[in-house]
Curated annotation (Swiss-Prot):
Belongs to the UreF family. Pfam families: UreF. It comes from the Bacteria. It is found in: Cytoplasm. One of its GO terms (molecular function) is nickel cation binding. Required for maturation of urease via the functional incorporation of the urease nickel metallocenter. This is Urease accessory protein UreF. The gene is ureF. UreD, UreF and UreG form a complex that acts as a GTP-hydrolysis-dependent molecular chaperone, activating the urease apoprotein by helping to assemble the nickel containing metallocenter of UreC. The UreE protein probably delivers the nickel.
Amino acid sequence: MIDHTHLRLFQFCDSQFPTGAFSHSFGLETYIQRNIIHDDHTFIAWLKMFLQEQLTYSDGLAMRLVYDALENDDTQKVLHIDKLMFVQNLPKETRVGAKQMGTRIVKLALELYNSPWIAWYHQQMQDKKAKLNPAICFTMLGHYLGVDIETIIDYYLYQNVSSLTQNAVRAIPLGQTAGQKIVTHMIPYIEETRKQIFELKEADFGMTAPGLELNQMAHENVNVRIFIS
């Protein structure tokens, strides 16, 4: 039997879903222009690093903490994590890009579902108390749909792997079949990343590799680009 609850959340993982992920490489384009990433093998190495760093210590850990806050109706905790997600994202393009994607996801989620938490989150943005982050909104949507946090994180990590791989297919470039092989190859690493997220302490939040952040910052000065970040 198909689990429609999970399918409703998985809809937001579609690389064609209009979240704006299509326009962001989150530093990948800088690595490509420097010829550090030039084929499927070098891209996989970068993607694993992105999973193990930014998506573990930032997005993934934030999702775990937000889910606990939702379970305890702790609005101040949610706002605190929203603020941390914004201020610890030092590269301007990725910081602004995450805010834009978060805004799109919140608006789309409100069009599709009547989630009190997402409606509250949107109101906090209008009151200038929140920035809106895609990882936080995705967690709120999964919580509203009754999906467990482990699955929510798995789906979010998969969405990032899928969208970044599609962007790599365009930018390196790679073939579509090569792209699908990469996604298949990364699935076990998604599970490993989620397990690592559940071993972290709250004090570990934001421990992103400086090399990744520096390349995200350097993207502001690339001569030719196809991505916003």
